[in-house]
């Protein structure tokens, strides 16, 4: 199991989404976007969990977010709502399809998605945010 392997596997899984057709999958929270739709993911939090006499397990939350640039056209804004929903379902499906991320974690859980409008550099984006919790048993070894 490796943390870098888990992130690499997430990248591979998210890159296979074809509907909606993302122009990029980014492993970082973006500061600006040159084109959309874009799918980004980043490490959000880490919590120590269960502990034994010899090791500690953890849960790391990866935030996955889809970005769709809003336009003045009502028709385009309406189509973005469907694309948001499709993105939420596809991210959920891809990540649940490989719960141990090709052997790089013990288990994982896809959380509840939320939708919001985000201002980034004066441009408005409609976003879908999906938390993804990765559990790694025995991540830290305790030396007596």
List each model region and its residues:
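A short glycine-rich, His/Asp/Glu-containing loop-to-beta-strand
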Residues: 36-41
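Charged, amphipathic alpha-helical segments and their flanking helix caps
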Residues: 1-33, 45-144
